């Protein structure tokens, strides 16, 4: 990667430019060194200017806003070109997505398709484009925000969980495909994180703050890791849940 003298990235791209977790990761990188931050978000997102201001206040060398509509996959090549037009991108964070109402999603075809297109199809679209660019660079780090919900899909939120299962599988495979080209991929599987998106939910065990996820993302990337859980204990929880028979699993209060 194009790093400074002590190994910090010079350019960070955030796909989902107003994502609280994504911005926390950017800010964590800025704690180490000033960097160019590129925020890709909806042109009418009311939080985009505040996000840019927060990055400047956190110490960004410069902040660029580019338009990104996850649903408009035909526009993604042009968006990625714009993101790389100012030079190589060292770190790209894929942190956009919807949660939705779990019970409504499986009973509403339009909303089910929408969340699948945003959480999975769009994530694949930008992943392929990022891989192409970083492969040409010969370096780069992709950080993909997955979810513990995708590791074993539960009845409680199976539409959302299934989209994250797809994203998770794609980026783990992309990690293998890019290994020989000097490009790294980190998949993060958080449980519940305290953000706007989860504010209406009852807090679950092992819930963490976005700053915890951000610190994990930066430190795990620096160590060359490919898959981490947030918190780490979720790895062992999911290890057990993955092997519980369906007849028993469906009776668990999760």
From Swiss-Prot:
Disruption phenotype: Traditional knockout mutant with dprE2 disruption could not be achieved, suggesting this gene is essential. Conditional knock-down mutant of dprE2 show that down-regulation of DprE2 results in growth arrest in vitro. Cells lacking this gene display impaired growth. Coiled coil: none annotated. It is an enzyme of class 1 (oxidoreductase). Its EC number is 1.1.1.333. Component of the DprE1-DprE2 complex that catalyzes the 2-step epimerization of decaprenyl-phospho-ribose (DPR) to decaprenyl-phospho-arabinose (DPA), a key precursor that serves as the arabinose donor required for the synthesis of cell-wall arabinans. DprE1 catalyzes the first step of epimerization, namely FAD-dependent oxidation of the C2' hydroxyl of DPR to yield the keto intermediate decaprenyl-phospho-2'-keto-D-arabinose (DPX). Was identified as a high-confidence drug target. Keywords: Cell wall biogenesis/degradation, NAD, Oxidoreductase, Periplasm. It catalyses: trans,octa-cis-decaprenylphospho-beta-D-arabinofuranose + NAD(+) = trans,octa-cis-decaprenylphospho-beta-D-erythro-pentofuranosid-2-ulose + NADH + H(+). This is Decaprenylphosphoryl-2-keto-beta-D-erythro-pentose reductase. The active site is at 160 (proton acceptor). Pfam families: adh_short. Pathway: Cell wall biogenesis; cell wall polysaccharide biosynthesis. It is found in: Periplasm. InterPro entries: NAD(P)-bd_dom_sf, Sc_DH/Rdtase_CS, SDR_fam. It comes from the Bacteria. One of its GO terms (biological process) is cell wall polysaccharide biosynthetic process. One of its GO terms (molecular function) is oxidoreductase activity. Interacts with DprE1 to form an epimerase complex. GO terms for cellular component: periplasmic space; plasma membrane. NAD(+) binds at residues 67, 164. Gene3D superfamilies: NAD(P)-binding Rossmann-like Domain. Belongs to the short-chain dehydrogenases/reductases (SDR) family.
């Amino acid at each position: 990667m194009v790093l400074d003298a002590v190994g910090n990235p010079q350019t960070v791209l955030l796909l989902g430019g107003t994502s609280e977790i994504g911005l926390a990761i950017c800010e964590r990188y800025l704690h180490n060194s000033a960097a160019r931050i590129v925020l890709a978000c909806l042109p009418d997102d009311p939080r985009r200017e505040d996000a840019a201001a927060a990055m400047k206040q956190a110490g960004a060398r410069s902040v660029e806003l580019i338009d990104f509509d996850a649903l408009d996959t035909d526009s993604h090549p042009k968006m990625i070109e714009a993101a790389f037009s100012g030079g190589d991108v060292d770190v790209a964070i894929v942190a956009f997505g919807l949660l939705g109402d779990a019970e409504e999603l499986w009973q509403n075809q339009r909303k089910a398709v929408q969340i699948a297109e945003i959480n999975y199809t769009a994530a694949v679209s930008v992943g392929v484009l990022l891989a192409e660019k970083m492969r040409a660079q010969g370096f780069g780090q992709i950080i993909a925000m997955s979810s513990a919900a995708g590791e074993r899909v539960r009845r409680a939120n199976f539409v959302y969980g299934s989209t994250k299962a797809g994203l998770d599988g794609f980026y783990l495979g992309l990690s293998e495909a890019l290994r020989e080209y000097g490009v790294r991929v980190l998949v993060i599987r958080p449980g519940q994180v305290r953000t706007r998106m989860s504010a209406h939910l009852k807090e679950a065990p092992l819930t963490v703050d976005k700053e915890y996820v951000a610190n994990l993302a930066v430190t795990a990337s620096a160590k060359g890791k490919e898959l981490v859980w947030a918190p780490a204990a979720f790895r062992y929880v999911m290890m057990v849940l993955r092997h519980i028979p369906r007849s028993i699993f469906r009776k668990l209060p999760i």
